[in-house]
Amino acid sequence: MKKHISLVLLILFLSASSLFAQEGFHLLTTMSGDSIGDQFSVVSHIGDINADGFDDVIVGAPGGDYAKLFFGGAVFDTIPDLIFKDYKQLNCYFGCAITGDGDINGDGYPDIIIGASDTWIGPSFPFEIMTTGAAYVYFGGPMIDTTADLTLIVGDWLTQTGWYYEFGSSVAIPGDLNGDGYDDFVIGAANDDYDAHGRVYIYYGGPNVDDQYDVLLEGEDVFDNFGFSLSAVGDMNNDGFDDVLIGAPMFHNNIPNKIYQGGKAYLVYGGNEINLTNSIEFTGDTSSYQYGRFISGLGDVNGDSINDLGIMGGEYFKIISGYDFYPVLTVYADTNKFGSYYNIAAANDINNDVYNDIFVGMQEAINNEAFNSIFVYYGGVTIDSIPDLEITQEANSFFQSAGFLGNINNDDYIDYILGAQDWYGGVTPGASRVNIYFFGLPDDVQEDINSIYLSNFILYQNYPNPFNSTTIIKYSIPKQEQVTLKIYDQLGRLVTTLVDVEKNVGQHQVEFHTDKLASGVYFYQLIAGNIILTNKLILLK
């Protein structure tokens, strides 16, 4: 049975003043996209892909058509171990959706699925079917590589099917839907053909899993966008089959002229036969819009031993009890501030009180700028509408996704990854970034950090990154050592030496400031004794 739920949400930075003031999230590291427009911010919980005992991290960058996999370790670094791409096609939006933490071929290792919703198929331009989409399956294990084990495409040039499907725009591994002992996987094509009623394709896992879908579910009406969102939820009705939650945010609720889309979500039950007849429907309020755009299986948030659901519309969200499918909480945004909600995700049990918790993203418009926050609602027997934590963001930074990582460095703290897109002037996407946090009390956190400092050489990701003129580079050494820290360009030419002196045990930092260098990628290298560590930094002017 699935224990971990794929998460979809958006986040960026915690302010430095709140980072260590109380029990809360503490920044472990920051990672950024390679270039402006990469949208490096799509994340998902994937588990221990390479079976080395550490949970791993994956981040998609659909604007740059890549996804980076970072193996966990006692010292987590920000140099990717594998980079996934579709090397045959550019601008295919590879990395727009990612899922993992399910073993679809039964080899004992969790697998990864990556969507590329804008993939074209056909002989060559202009004889191609536009944005039919694709999804790629990579089997986990110690020998995982960047060659897809399965390539999934449902469009066909000869029959001229697949126009505008955007297959792969949503992906999920919801568990064992048909009860055969293997995890199954689900791919959405919400914009299918010309009418956008939406489709969801279900593939049954197994030792001989292939690229042919086993079940096709379709939206009820035109423009429903059925399959826009997908989420694993576990076995909601305790019948031995896992289930799946599907969003149709443009469902029109019988509103005249179909102008205002109330939206809908479907809890589709697994079983020997899977169809929409055997499902529970959650219909949005006719006074609002796009209910089901963001959905999440939340785990058990109220302590009744039954998994619960989160379903969000543009101006409100509901926490749905898995016991009777009635809302246990409904919260509306402040429309006077042009407020709207922008994602919901499971957070597992952040504060260790045995109740699962909830991430909620919200944005408001203030003085012609968009501001984002992430709210944390602690689970409990009763849950009220007042968030327990609020994390505010920089202007024009928009939450993209969030994930429960597990423990990527075995430091006794659960880690979380939170990604966001930067938008310049509200219209141009930036390189974007993700932060990895762990949660705890300041004294406990500092004690654990000190123990890490005293046992490892560590070169941290510079902050901020990308940067304009000035950035901070931190490093720690476990013994007194002669240290050099140098900056190089992409050709390996020395730019400057920041440190060349003997340093004592502990954490150190240095400021790198430049007004003369051109925008681009540079490298900083730490040498301490026979230890050499290198990281990348990005200068944007």
Task: Give, region by region, the residue ranges found by the protein language model.
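Residues in and immediately flanking transmembrane alpha helices
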Residues: 15-16, 256, 478
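Positively charged, lysine/arginine-rich intrinsically disordered segments
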Residues: 445-449
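C-terminal outer-membrane/trafficking sorting elements
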Residues: 450-463, 467-541
